């Protein structure tokens, strides 16, 4: 599913979408490797989106909320070599406020996996262009305070309801015309809060 309003896009992370894009834009993505062990479909879509954003000279910074060890952030940094890249994460695993909310809301029955095996230094050491990276360590949205930038590409990979909906509320109004928000775990049954947050924002904003 892709939703487009005035050039702004919210992407549901589904294999169907990636295969459809691969077929439609075969000159950008090798169709035979999308969604296979040889090609991460998220990276394939990121590559396509980066080419379009660069091709049309779309302004704005890039960002990722939910960086963990920097695997996907490294790809964003690679495909947007001239873009400022904001990296939002606690770098200490999930915040107890977010996990408690999901459990109390019935979105989860148990504490999610631990993602604390990371650090700012580890993430930055993986970056091709670390000089472009701005690390915002702590609880989102508090760590977004004072940011005046607009954004051309945003990855939301925070798994839980509260950070995902906070990310959408912060980034969507700041998304430039033609910008992209990529949302991970929309169809991941282990993290239903991600889907719930997206649906609420779409319903509230009439993004059908």
Locate each region found by the language model.
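A short alpha-helical cap/connector motif
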Residues: 1-208
């Amino acid at each position: 599913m892709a939703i487009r309003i005035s050039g702004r896009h919210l992407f549901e992370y589904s294999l169907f979408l990636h295969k459809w894009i691969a077929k439609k834009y075969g000159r950008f993505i090798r169709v035979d490797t999308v969604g296979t062990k040889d090609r991460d479909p998220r990276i394939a879509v990121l590559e396509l989106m980066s080419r379009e954003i660069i091709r049309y000279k779309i302004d704005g910074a890039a960002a990722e909320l939910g960086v963990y060890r920097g695997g996907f952030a490294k790809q964003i940094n690679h495909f947007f070599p001239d873009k400022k890249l904001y990296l939002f994460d606690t770098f200490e695993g999930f915040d107890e406020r977010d996990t408690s909310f999901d459990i109390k809301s019935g979105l989860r029955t148990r504490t999610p996996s631990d993602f604390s095996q990371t650090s700012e230094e580890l993430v930055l050491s993986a970056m091709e262009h670390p000089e472009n990276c701005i690390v915002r360590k702590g609880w989102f949205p508090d760590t977004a305070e004072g940011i005046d930038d607009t954004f051309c590409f945003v990855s939301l990979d925070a798994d839980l309801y509260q950070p995902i909906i906070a990310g959408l509320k912060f980034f969507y109004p700041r998304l430039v015309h033609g910008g992209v928000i990529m949302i991970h775990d929309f169809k991941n049954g282990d993290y239903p809060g991600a889907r719930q947050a997206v649906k609420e924002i779409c319903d509230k904003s009439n993004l059908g």
